[in-house]
Structure formats: C-alpha cells, structure tokens
C-alpha cells in the first residue's frame, strides 16, 4: 500500500510540473557590480520630432497668439513635461520630411515664409512657422541638444553647407549677418548633423555604394569651426540589412562619426496589416514583443560587421528611429500616424532600453518615433488638453540610467509561450548611477503570471531598495483625455535585500525600476 501511495504521489507531482507554465518557475541571476562595463550614454533616451501630422503644430508649437498657454509659441504644458524627462537630444526636421525640407523656407519673419507642400505625410500645406530658430529655441527650453537632419534627397552640398555655416559660424559673413538680423547673433552648438535620411527609401532609393559617394561628397563641404563641429551621421540601414554598415564603416573615412539605423515594431507580419493599437488580444501582445526583441539580433549583426573595420568602436551605431507602428485609426488621416499608446507600448519601450544598455559600447544615441502625437508618442494633445502616455512614464522611470555605467547581468529566465511564439519571460539590465546607487530595470513579458526572481549582487553591498512599478489590468490599458492617469507608476515595495541578494516577485505584464543604495 505504501508503494502505491508513493507511486501515485510521484505521478501527481510529475503531472503538476508538466502542466506548469514556464513562468511558474523562478528566475535566478547575478548583477556583476564587480565588472563595470560601458557608459550608458544619456543620448540613448533621445526624442524625434518631424513635420508630420500634429507632431509639431498643435503638439509642440501653437504660435504666440494662441489661447493655449505658451512661451514664445511653445506649449507650456508640453515643455514642462519634456523637461521632466531630462530629454538629452531631439532629432529634427525628419524623417522623410528632411529630404524635401529647404531650410531657407523656415527663417526670417514668419509672415514672409512660403507655404510649401508636405508630400510625404498627407499632402498637406506646410506653413514653415516652425523653422531653424524655433527648433533651436525649443530644445534650449527643454534642456536638450540639437540633432539636425540635412536634405540630400532634394538638396545640394551647397545648401547643406550654407545651413551649417548659418548655424555654427562665428565669422562675419553674409550668412551670419542674416542670422543676426533674424534674432540670433551668436552661433549655435549643434551636437549631431545627419547627411540624409533613409537613403535606401524615401531619401533617394540609393544603393549603399552610391550613397557612400554622396556622403563623402557632402561631408567634404560641411566645414565648421573646429570646436563647433557636430557629429556627422551617415544614413544607414534598417531591419536585417547589414550591407549599409559594411559599406559605410569600411570606406566612410574620417568624417564618419556614426551610422543611423531604423527598426519599427509591428504586431503583424507585413506593413499592409500592421495590427491595431488597441483592442488586441494576447496573440498580438506576444507577437509585438517577439518582434521588438529582434532589435537585439539586428544590433548584434551590425556591430559584428562594424567591429571588423572599427575595433576601437569610434563609429557609433545610432538607432535614430524606433518604436511601435500600428494601422491608422478609423476616421483619421492615415498620413498623420496618430495612434494610441498602451501598456504594451510601455513594455516595448522598456525592452528596447534594456537591449540598448547591453550594446552601450556601440549604440550611443537613439531617438524614439516620435515625441508628440505621432507613433509611439510621449505626449498626446487635444486642443488645450495634454495626456502623458505609458511610454512617457517608462522614459521617466529610466532616468537614472542616463550616463550610468553598465553592470553586466546573468539571468536564467523561464520562457513565455503562446502557440508558436516563445520569448524570454523576463528582461533585466543594471547600472551604477552617477550617485553611486545601483539601478535595476526588470520587465515581465508574461501578461498572466508573476515570476519570482533572485539576483545575487557581486562586488557591492546594498542596504536599502526602493522602486516604482508600471502595470495595469488590461493589455491595452491606456491614458485618455477623460482618464489621464489610468496607467501611471506606483511605488513598488515588493523587493527585499538580504545577504547581497535581491529577491522579488515580478508582477505580470509589468515594468519595475529599482534603486539599490
């Protein structure tokens, strides 16, 4: 009888283990505070503002005569919210728009500026009220640096060279005199300058070899004072295409400081059926996360090629367009790319940050698309009202990682599986912050189950732990103008430190950022 009971107990236990989801199993790992890695450049948390839909006008710019409270035409609420994020850099004016933008259309008295046509995004008139001076005034207001994207597609080396002289020269020339007449006698400091955008597509449909010659031609004439030269960024590849990295890094020459890279996360398998921003099920939840995790593969593939020609990692790999892209909302202009922003987008943002951190030795700037009212936005506006998205809150939670030092992590994580899709259930990164604390970012991709986690801390002693959590009940939980605080961070008290070990149960579909002191 005793043997029968033991046998039955074993069968029941085996059946229980077999039926358990992967996330019923604990995760264990190590934070290597004893092996500090690369600096996580604050520019990994950059923004992108294109003349597209309501991204600039109504989003950032309302004009000085607007009833919406503003300073010099910039929305007070948006400026204040962006300052809270410690935005390091903003990319402008595009995007595809950059290769049809002629900078002279956006300087001088606003009433005298020409109205042009935005052929890329909805075929709508472009007032040019927001131009060079307005952009540089704006980034100064929010405490950010400037990343300007030059026009290769419909421009010329002379046009680009004159724009850079207008921006940076301190010599008495006709261009600097014009700048002074337009209200800015002193030159600006431009941190980054790109020679074209998506030259494989909307920027000219070029081959890497053809664009290489174009880049070197333009770079020859982009002359600035030695101490005012921006980082020159070449238009690089996208998705799994590594040919651009191979061609540009092997032959780009001394003027090449970085190459760009673009990758968007879509739930579907092709651009004609990307998937919905809201009202989706768990199948689109996991497919979205599986697709966003490909960012790691793409960075690794490009970095391996760059390492062949640039082992000292002098050339940066800048992901200056990334984020989610869904089908347009019914009833809205498709070319305006307005979409809602949910808890899923917050998880996507956190996953990408953890990926970028691991490649901080090569990835030194990224720019999410886009800042306000476009794609995976930080902020949505409607008339005088403003709402902060779940993605905004993730950027805010990750502020301690800006200019922190990467601490390598090891994690034995279970997998989250649904049908044919399977992804790691947990994502983690850690860093030593400027204040000496250890920041730990954790993401639970499983929308149904919490996961117990234990992380040993090697090479450091911490006595206290505090944190924040972002989660919600629904997969597509979102903030609206009627309910602006439906998804927002809350204090997290579920982590315990004991004997150099950090233990917690990471709630389902959550982002948690901890500070260990």
Where are each of the predicted segments found?
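Active-site His/acidic residue clusters
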Residues: 264-286, 332
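Histidine-centered catalytic micro-motifs
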Residues: 261
């Amino acid at each position: 009888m005793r043997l029968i009971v033991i046998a039955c107990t074993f069968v029941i236990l085996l059946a229980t283990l077999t039926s358990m989801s992967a996330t019923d199993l604990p995760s264990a790992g190590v934070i290597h505070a004893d092996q500090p890695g690369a600096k996580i450049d604050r520019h990994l948390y950059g923004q992108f503002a294109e003349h597209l839909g309501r991204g600039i006008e109504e989003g950032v710019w309302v004009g000085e005569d607007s009833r919406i409270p503003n300073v010099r035409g910039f929305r007070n609420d948006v400026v204040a919210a962006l300052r809270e994020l410690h935005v390091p850099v903003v990319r402008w004016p595009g995007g595809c728009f950059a290769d049809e933008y002629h900078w002279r259309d956006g300087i001088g008295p606003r009433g005298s500026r020409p109205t042009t046509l935005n052929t890329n995004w909805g075929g709508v008139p472009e007032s040019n009220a927001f131009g060079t001076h307005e952009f540089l005034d704006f980034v100064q207001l929010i405490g950010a640096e400037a990343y300007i994207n030059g026009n290769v597609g419909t421009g010329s080396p002379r046009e680009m060279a004159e724009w850079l002289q207008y921006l940076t020269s301190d010599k008495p020339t006709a261009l600097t005199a014009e700048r002074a007449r337009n209200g800015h006698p002193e030159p600006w400091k431009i941190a980054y300058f790109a020679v074209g955008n998506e030259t494989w597509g909307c920027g000219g449909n070029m081959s890497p070899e053809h664009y290489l010659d174009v880049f070197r031609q333009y770079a020859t004439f982009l002359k600035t004072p030695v101490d005012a030269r921006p980082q020159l960024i070449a238009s690089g590849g996208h998705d799994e295409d590594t040919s651009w990295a191979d061609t540009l890094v092997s032959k780009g020459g001394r003027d090449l400081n970085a190459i760009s890279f673009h990758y968007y996360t879509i739930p579907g398998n092709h651009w004609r059926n990307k998937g919905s921003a809201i009202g989706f099920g768990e199948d689109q939840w996991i497919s979205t996360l599986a697709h966003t995790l490909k960012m790691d593969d793409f960075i690794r593939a490009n970095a391996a090629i760059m390492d062949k020609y640039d082992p000292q990692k002098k050339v940066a790999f800048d992901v200056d367009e990334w984020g989610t892209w869904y089908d347009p909302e019914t009833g809205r202009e498709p070319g305006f790319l307005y979409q809602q922003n949910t808890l899923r987008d917050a998880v996507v943002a956190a996953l990408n940050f953890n990926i970028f951190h691991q490649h901080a030795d090569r990835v030194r700037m990224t720019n999410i698309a886009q800042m306000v009212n476009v794609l995976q936005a930080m902020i949505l506006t409607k008339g005088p009202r403003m709402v902060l998205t779940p993605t905004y809150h993730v950027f805010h939670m990750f502020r301690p990682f800006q200019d922190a030092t990467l601490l390598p992590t090891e994690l034995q994580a279970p997998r989250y599986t649904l049908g044919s899709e399977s992804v790691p259930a947990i994502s983690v990164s850690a860093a030593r912050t400027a204040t000496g604390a250890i920041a730990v970012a954790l993401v639970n991709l499983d929308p149904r189950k919490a996961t117990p986690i234990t992380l040993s801390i090697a090479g450091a002693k911490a006595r206290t732990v505090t944190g924040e959590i972002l989660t919600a009940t629904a997969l597509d939980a979102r903030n609206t103008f009627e309910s602006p605080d439906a998804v927002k961070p809350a204090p997290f008290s579920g982590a315990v430190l004991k004997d150099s070990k950090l233990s917690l149960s990471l709630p389902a579909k959550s982002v948690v950022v901890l500070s260990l002191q």
